[in-house]
Amino acid sequence: MKIQLIAVGQKMPDWVKVGFEEYQRRFPKDMPFELIEIPAGKRGKNADIKRILEQEGKAMLAAAGKGKVVTLDIPGKPWTTEQLASQLEAWKNDGRDVCLLIGGPEGLSPECKAAAEQSWSLSPLTLPHPMVRVIVAESLYRAWSLTTNHPYHRE
């Protein structure tokens, strides 16, 4: 199983790249973790946000291919570390790649939400999208460490 984090936005600050890559490199070879960046639509005073969301959504779903789509969205289900570890095991048993979608400033398109088999909420707070990349990477690594009795996770 491969995990893909499909996120709207490019040209992230260095701390985002460094933080994400720190956890990305720790994943085992049999569970590669990859970041796919979708260019954000041009936003401005007269931008057609509905059209931009639609274009970003199409690009995200195209990148997901036949993988299991899981959106990161405030109304989603919050998981504890233990619940995320169980999800990780269930995803492995499913046999498909897992595609986690992070939307842009206006969130995810209705098409992405409709395509999602699951929706995960990190917090009821609105989080900066660059920070979400790092939080997701660390959370998934921690969940993996729990499933393999790796000493990274401590109770």
Swiss-Prot record:
It is found in: Cytoplasm. Keywords: Cytoplasm, Methyltransferase, rRNA processing, S-adenosyl-L-methionine, Transferase. It catalyses: pseudouridine(1915) in 23S rRNA + S-adenosyl-L-methionine = N(3)-methylpseudouridine(1915) in 23S rRNA + S-adenosyl-L-homocysteine + H(+). One of its GO terms (molecular function) is rRNA (pseudouridine-N3-)-methyltransferase activity. The keyword Cytoplasm applies. InterPro entries: Alpha/beta_knot_MTases, RlmH-like, tRNA_m1G_MTases_N. Its main location: cytoplasm. S-adenosyl-L-methionine binds at L72, G103, L122, S123, P124, L125, T126, L127. GO terms for cellular component: cytoplasm. SUPFAM superfamilies: alpha/beta knot. It holds the Pfam family SPOUT_MTase. It comes from the Bacteria. Its EC number is 2.1.1.177. The keyword Cytoplasm applies. Homodimer. Specifically methylates the pseudouridine at position 1915 (m3Psi1915) in 23S rRNA. Belongs to the RNA methyltransferase RlmH family. This is Ribosomal RNA large subunit methyltransferase H. It comes from Actinobacillus pleuropneumoniae serotype 5b (strain L20).
